[in-house]
Amino acid sequence: DRAVAAGATYIVSPGINPEVVKHCQRVGIPVIPGCSTASEIEIALSLGLKTVKFFPAEAVGGLKTIKALSAPYVDVNFVPTGGINEVNLLEYLNFSKIVACGGSWMVDQKAIDAKDWDAIETLTSSAVNRMLGFELKHIGINSGTPEQAMKDALSLAKILGWPVKDGNSSTFTGTALEFMKKPFRGAHGHIALGTNYIQRARWYLEQKGFAFDDESSYYKDGKLMAIYFKDEIAGFAFHLLQK
């Protein structure tokens, strides 16, 4: 109750206490209790929960144990904490049953004691950037016609020594330069920003005020692979691209 009064929007606990879970459910706040065994997961399921904290993650077998527990409990998702850091963060997040990770490296105790919120912001931002892994994947240039696209691609190939690959709608020089065969998005062209997790990247950027064009969404095997921002930047259309 004190946590909610202080502004908490969800509760995470190191272990599972049915009374605490039931109280959170009564007051309407999401709760993620700690579970590291099959018996504890059974308790969580009996309380109607399908997302649990996995703690202490590294000490009880880490990702190997989570995968073993996921085999019989196919509907359960995990939030591992305990021993998670920037080195192993992506290894955990790459497993589909893990919805989030927690780690104390993001909230250094010395910074907390000193109320150095800027330092904590820097640490947490670094963790988010590590997770999302943004990088420039390719630049699309509106050549306008198939002939011009090929001409432009060959010209850049002479400069860079990269191979040319002709496709249905565009011609690539290497993998970084795409020449469009007909007018496409963006006054000047488009830029693809690769990310490790496109759904997480979208949510993160929406919190920063960016909007996306859902009609531009491209799915493969039921998974979102690409989506454009609604607004251009410097005359370029930008889109996220799942790595």
Give the predicted meaning of each segment:
Residues 1, 8-16, 30-41, 50-58, ...:
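Catalytic beta/alpha-barrel core
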Residues 1-6, 39-47, 71, 84-100:
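Catalytic cores of alpha/beta
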Residues 4, 21-26, 45, 66-71, ...:
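Surface-exposed amphipathic alpha-helices with a cationic face
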Residues 24-28, 110-132:
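C-terminal helical cap(s) of enzyme catalytic domains, especially alpha/beta-barrels
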Residues 145-160, 200-209:
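Amphipathic alpha-helical segments
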